[in-house]
Each structure stands twice: as C-alpha cells, then as structure tokens.
C-alpha cells in the first residue's frame, strides 16, 4: 500500500515545485488549498488548472475567513499591497503582507486531514527567501510544529511519527525555479502575485512578483505568465 502525503498547494511556483517533486515518488497525494480572501482567489482558480497535470488522489479547497486578522495587506482591504521597482527595494524585515499565524493555521488543517486519511507526511513549500521576511517559514518553526504535531495527536502519542517536510527549505527562489525547470514544471500555470488584476494579470511590482521575476531572470528564462 502506498504511503499518503498531504501537500499544501497555493498555486505558486514554490508549492507547485514541491508537488512535482512528490509526484515523482511513490506517495499517494492529497492536496490542500485555502481560499481566504479575494486577493488569493485567483490562486485557487489557477490550482484547478495545474493540478490536472498530476496524479492527485484528492484536492480539497478549504474556505476560511482570515479578514479578522486586520493589519495584513493580504487580508485587509484597507491596506494597499506595497509596490517596488526592483529587488534592492524589497524589505528586509517582516512586511505588511505577512498574515498572522497563516502557516500555523494551514499546517493545522493539513495535520487534521493527515490524521483522518492516515497520512504521516505533510509537505510545505517554504524556502530561504521566505524565512528572511516571514517568521513562520523558518527551519526552527517547521521543526517546532512537527514536535507539536507529534505531541498533540493520537497517532503521535501512539508512536506513529508525523513528519513535516520542507524540501525547499535551504533553497533560494532562483534555485527553486532552476530545479523546477529541470523537473519539467509548467510555471505558466502558476501565479505569485499579491495583487493581480481582475482578469488575471500579475502586477509585476509586489514583493512576490519582483522575487519571481528576478528568479527567472537569474536562470536566463522568460517568465511564462502575463504581467500588466
């Protein structure tokens, strides 16, 4: 019997690269995505298209309301998504696009799904560039959540270890794109933008777009998605 894996899938290049990596193993894949605000609704639409390229046993989209977490540009309509011209302008501290406890919420859902379906492996696409800005993307956080998962679940208490996998944790965005291209990821079906237009164009100026464009440029490859 195949082992089961839960993958957090956002529709961006990082989680899609993780999906590609896991798809080349013997895991039976259960993908989990979240619809939490209008600004990420396009991500959910994109996922429906890209997931058809993979042998995914089940894909769940969880609707959750994170708008009560005011103070983040990704959940608060009163805060504009910051725009930049290049990587030199990107913030070195925690940006306003940080969503309080987001990965803790997402991983908690993934943990619940894993217990229900009998999975012991959870995959997430955090990486080096992420944990420069987002505290819930750091290696220490991943290790701590894994420790909590094994203390707070029936399977963990019974000695069936739950593992949180972050296969990109030591990679930069540039290295992730390089790896994905080598594996054959179709990045035209992904989106990174924090502030896309209603017709699906990426803004090209938010933190995520700037980082994505820079990663493709460093790989001497044209980003296949459309920008404003």
UniProtKB/Swiss-Prot annotation:
Binds 1 zinc ion per subunit. Zn(2+) binds at residues 193, 203, 206, 209. InterPro entries: QueC, Rossmann-like_a/b/a_fold. Keywords: ATP-binding, Ligase, Metal-binding, Nucleotide-binding, Queuosine biosynthesis, Zinc. Pathway: Purine metabolism; 7-cyano-7-deazaguanine biosynthesis. One of its GO terms (biological process) is queuosine biosynthetic process. ATP binds at residues 9-19. SUPFAM superfamilies: Adenine nucleotide alpha hydrolases-like. GO terms for molecular function: ATP binding; ligase activity, forming carbon-nitrogen bonds; zinc ion binding. It comes from the Bacteria. It catalyses: 7-carboxy-7-deazaguanine + NH4(+) + ATP = 7-cyano-7-deazaguanine + ADP + phosphate + H2O + H(+). It is an enzyme of class 6 (ligase). Its cofactor is Zn(2+). Its EC number is 6.3.4.20. Catalyzes the ATP-dependent conversion of 7-carboxy-7-deazaguanine (CDG) to 7-cyano-7-deazaguanine (preQ(0)). PANTHER family: 7-CYANO-7-DEAZAGUANINE SYNTHASE. Belongs to the QueC family. This is 7-cyano-7-deazaguanine synthase. It comes from Rickettsia africae (strain ESF-5). The lineage of its organism: Bacteria, Pseudomonadati, Pseudomonadota, Alphaproteobacteria, Rickettsiales.
